[in-house]
């Protein structure tokens, strides 16, 4: 099965580089290229890609608003936001807009391919090296944590709540399984269950909710390795 990728970036050299990486990999193909947010929205509608690589800073319409409109349109495409580094203050907003993850632009070709495959599989890109730092940084800018727990969170079992806390720390399925002494299949089952109960699309949205609800706060968490 071929994964079709829409590349959205205002720099032609960047688009060309991504195209070369994608076309060199079996099972991946480029669905199209957009140089701004408006083109991204139009091509997402016209080409029906599986994955969209979305730059944040583009002319006419930025990647954040493009992401929001594509998600709101009901597109099945999974959106991977591209950023220069964690100083990019727009990444958090893009994730809130419905992106399924993000990747540094200087990632190695193999990392880009892996990210596309992860997103296409319906998962979210939550690498601890990037995700936790970014979410912690932007969580500090959030309003004071809520004094009451969102109703949906009360529907989670104790184990699902624990899984959500660990997800917010950027743990992978394998790391979650090791921490909880269960199989990866069991972890996936817990994640699917909590996403369904919370009415969320993917893990990224679950992590955002955990921070916004005060379930997790920036910095080391109880039980983290020293």
Where are these regions (language model features)?
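Short amphipathic alpha-helix used as the core "switch/output" element in two-component signaling
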Residues: 42, 64-76
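Active-site residues of response regulator receiver
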Residues: 9, 55, 83
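Receiver (REC) domain active-site loop signature in two-component systems and cognate sites
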Residues: 58
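Basic, Lys/Arg-enriched C-terminal extension of HTH/homeodomain DNA-binding domains
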Residues: 195-226
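Acidic catalytic/metal-coordinating carboxylates
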Residues: 36-39, 61-65
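Short, flexible helix-to-coil linker/hinge segments that flank and couple to helix-turn-helix
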Residues: 91-96, 101, 106-158, 162, ...
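Acidic, metal-coordinating helix/loop segments flanking the phosphotransfer/catalytic sites
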Residues: 33-51
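Recognition helix of helix-turn-helix DNA-binding domains
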Residues: 170-205
């Amino acid at each position: 099965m071929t994964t079709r990728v829409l590349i959205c970036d205002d720099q032609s050299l960047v688009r060309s580089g991504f195209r070369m990486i994608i076309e060199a990999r079996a099972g991946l193909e480029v669905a199209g290229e957009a140089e701004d947010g408006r083109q991204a929205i139009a091509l997402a509608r016209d080409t029906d890609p599986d994955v969209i690589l979305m730059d944040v800073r583009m002319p006419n319409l930025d990647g954040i608003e493009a992401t929001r409109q594509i998600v709101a349109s009901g597109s099945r495409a999974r959106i991977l936001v591209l950023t220069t580094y964690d100083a990019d203050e727009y990444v958090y907003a893009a994730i809130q807009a419905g992106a399924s993850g993000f990747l540094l632009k200087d990632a190695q070709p193999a990392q880009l391919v892996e990210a596309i495959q992860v997103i296409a599989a319906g998962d979210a890109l939550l690498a601890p090296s990037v995700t936790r730092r970014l979410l912690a940084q932007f969580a500090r800018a959030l309003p004071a944590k809520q004094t009451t727990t969102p109703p949906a969170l009360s529907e989670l079992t104790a184990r699902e709540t624990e899984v959500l806390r660990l997800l917010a720390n950027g743990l992978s399925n394998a790391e979650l399984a090791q921490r909880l002494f269960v199989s990866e299949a069991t972890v996936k089952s817990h994640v699917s269950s909590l996403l369904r109960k919370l009415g969320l699309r993917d893990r990224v949205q679950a992590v955002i909710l955990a921070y916004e609800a005060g379930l997790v706060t920036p910095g080391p968490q109880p039980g983290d390795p020293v």
